[in-house]
């Protein structure tokens, strides 16, 4: 399939019309998107060859290019993003087939269900941008700081996310916004003792990490589970402890060590009021896939050569000559960096040897597109929310947290009136993980149908409400699932556009310890060496972390191995470069053709759309 095939993709960031309130500078065009692929590579040498355009690889390419390194960046796919891609539904269908054929390393058990197929379930594939590894970005984070420093933020749009819901006692609640003194002391559902305990704990979390009392307390409790620490030290128990640990801290399991949990909770708290009254943002039109593309554009302006639909077929470590599937040969002066999904066949044994001593971790994902915008779960003027199911909160007795990111049409990932539910779990037993995800989906389905029902007026009673500080009656929880609604059966059913799930393997620990801590770097494949050459390096698969934490740390590990130091990582005065940058961006232009429609039923197969021949999806 030609790489420059506009029928299979959504409009790129350079082609789409930005929001009225957002006026980006000239966005440079990118090979394989606005500019067609060259038939063969037009260079005879480069310093660094990078295989795969995932988020880590794209940031690495830009960081090297802006230091004057000649980078050749290729991808065997005909789209950008690799394992961090943002894909249309048709692309996802083909991706699932490739996964199950064993063509996509580190992914398995991909299943997709389109109720009724496209004959009765009408939709335009290109109206959807679905992330393979969805992420949220904290307002106070190293990735966001780099986006601003590198000027890549100019190519992106971000939206606030302030609603975090936690599921407990068969109810959805959103009390975790109670993270300020004002909120805590005006919350009538909390006792005075609990309010004081919360304030004491939040004050402790926000203390400087170098405070001697805080350091000693964390050291004394370094191996103590956070639940035990909250109870013994601050007198906090469930439900407040659950909200702190799993919604604010976004921990993925119970028994998280106290220092890690406190750091996670602080991440949330210090992100408030950085850009507004919210802690988290999401990138519009897609997550890691959009950001990957942004860094690729930056790298291209700095001189990186790009080519999609191209594979490395051979590399001579003595002559340092790389041969590619398009017939071209290029001398690689320094290093080759390969993403796990892009490792060529001749390096498969080397990759296996490099990773054989590493512990694999699985993350199981279930993504569902529904014809309901779920505005009931979101703050006014926002288009995203997070739902968390703590351990033991589901009928399946989930041992790990189920985390769900919800985005509706306002985020540009689907049509208006619809939403995408991204759920995942770190449960290592795949069958158990699938049951947990299905159970969480059913709870959310029942909740949104109840929430959006129009005949609720006579079902609520006084105990479903509390009075806020202004004297206004308010529902006890965000989803209106008071006790009197537990037996309410909505008349409608949830209309599903598409539902698909898959299992991903990574060598990044769910707690990110082998990425964030230099003492555990030996357990990271970025530090592994190939037996017959020092010139080949591997990057990691995306982690199970819901945020972008750990990404920059991993990029810096690779950058340091290549250059010898990470002190000059993105050490560029972009303010002085802005004029030159804008001229370079403006000079890259191409004629943008109108996209033609896809034949909706061209590859419809009811058996493959309904796994195991079932009428409903079984994950």
Which residue ranges define each predicted feature?
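Conserved flavin/dinucleotide-binding core of flavoenzymes
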Residues: 413-619
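Mid-domain catalytic core of redox enzymes
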Residues: 279-283, 293-302, 311-453
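A conserved beta-strand/loop element that lines the FAD pocket in flavoprotein oxidoreductases
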Residues: 155-159, 301-312
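Rossmann-like flavin
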Residues: 131-134, 140-270, 281-283
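Extreme N-terminal leader/targeting segments of oxidoreductases
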Residues: 2-48, 66-70, 89-115, 119, ...
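Gly/Ala-rich phosphate-binding loop of Rossmann-like dinucleotide-binding domains
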Residues: 61, 65
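N-terminal FAD cofactor-binding segment of flavoenzymes
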Residues: 76-162
């Amino acid at each position: 399939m030609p790489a420059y095939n506009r029928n299979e993709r959504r409009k790129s960031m350079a082609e789409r019309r930005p929001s009225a309130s957002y006026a980006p500078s000239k966005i440079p065009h990118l090979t394989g998107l606005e500019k067609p692929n060259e038939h063969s590579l037009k260079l005879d040498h480069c310093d660094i060859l990078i295989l795969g355009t995932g988020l880590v690889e794209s940031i690495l390419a830009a960081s090297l290019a802006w230091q004057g390194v000649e980078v050749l960046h290729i991808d065997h796919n005909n789209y950008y993003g690799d394992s961090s891609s943002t894909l249309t539904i048709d692309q996802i269908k083909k991706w699932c087939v490739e996964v199950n054929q064993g063509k996509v390393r580190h992914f398995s058990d991909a299943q997709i269900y389109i109720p009724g197929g496209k004959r009765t379930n009408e939709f335009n594939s290109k109206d959807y941008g679905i992330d393979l590894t969805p992420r949220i970005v904290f307002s106070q984070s190293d990735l966001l700081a780099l986006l601003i420093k590198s000027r890549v933020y100019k190519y992106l749009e971000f939206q606030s996310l302030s609603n975090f819901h936690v599921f407990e006692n068969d109810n959805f609640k959103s009390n975790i916004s109670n993270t300020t003194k004002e909120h805590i002391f005006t919350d009538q559902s909390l006792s005075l003792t609990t309010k004081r305990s919360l304030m004491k704990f939040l004050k402790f979390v926000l203390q400087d990490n170098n405070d001697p009392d805080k350091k000693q307390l964390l050291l004394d409790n370094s191996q103590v589970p956070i639940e035990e620490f909250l109870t013994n030290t601050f007198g906090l128990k469930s439900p407040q402890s659950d909200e702190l640990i799993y919604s604010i801290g976004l921990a993925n399991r119970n028994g998280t060590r106290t220092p890690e949990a406190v750091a996670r909770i602080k991440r949330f708290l210090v992100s408030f009021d950085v850009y507004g009254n919210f802690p988290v943002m999401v990138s519009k039109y897609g997550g890691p896939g959009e950001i990957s593309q942004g860094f690729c554009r930056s790298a291209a302006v700095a001189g990186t050569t790009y080519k999609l639909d191209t594979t490395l077929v051979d590399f001579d470590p003595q002559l340092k000559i790389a041969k590619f599937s398009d017939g071209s040969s290029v001398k690689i002066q320094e290093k080759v960096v390969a993403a796990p999904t892009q490792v060529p066949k001749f390096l498969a044994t080397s990759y296996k040897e490099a990773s054989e001593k590493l512990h694999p971790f699985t993350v199981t994902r279930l993504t569902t597109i529904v014809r309901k915008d779920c505005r009931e779960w979101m703050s006014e003027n926002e288009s995203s929310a997070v739902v968390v199911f703590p351990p033991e909160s589901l009928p399946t007795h989930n041992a790990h947290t189920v985390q769900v990111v919800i985005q509706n049409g306002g985020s540009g990932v689907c049509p208006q009136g619809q939403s995408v539910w991204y759920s995942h779990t770190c449960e290592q037993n795949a069958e158990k993980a699938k049951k947990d995800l299905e159970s969480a989906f059913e709870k959310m389905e029942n909740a949104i149908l109840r929430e959006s029902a129009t005949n609720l007026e006579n079902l609520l009673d006084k105990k479903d409400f509390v009075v806020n500080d202004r004297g206004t009656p308010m529902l006890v929880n965000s989803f209106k699932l008071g006790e009197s609604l537990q037996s309410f059966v909505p008349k409608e059913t949830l209309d599903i556009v598409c539902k698909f799930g898959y299992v991903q393997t990574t060598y990044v620990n769910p707690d990110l310890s082998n990425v964030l801590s230099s003492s555990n770097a030996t357990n990271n494949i970025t530090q592994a060496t190939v037996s017959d050459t020092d010139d080949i390096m591997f990057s990691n698969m995306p982690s199970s972390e819901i945020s972008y934490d750990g990404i920059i740390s991993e990029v810096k590990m690779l950058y340091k191995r290549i250059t010898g130091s990470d002190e000059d990582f993105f050490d560029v005065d972009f303010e002085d470069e802005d004029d030159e940058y804008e001229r370079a961006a403006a000079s890259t232009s191409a004629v943008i053709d109108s996209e033609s429609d896809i034949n909706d039923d061209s590859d419809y197969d009811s058996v493959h759309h309904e796994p195991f021949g079932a009428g409903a999806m079984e994950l």
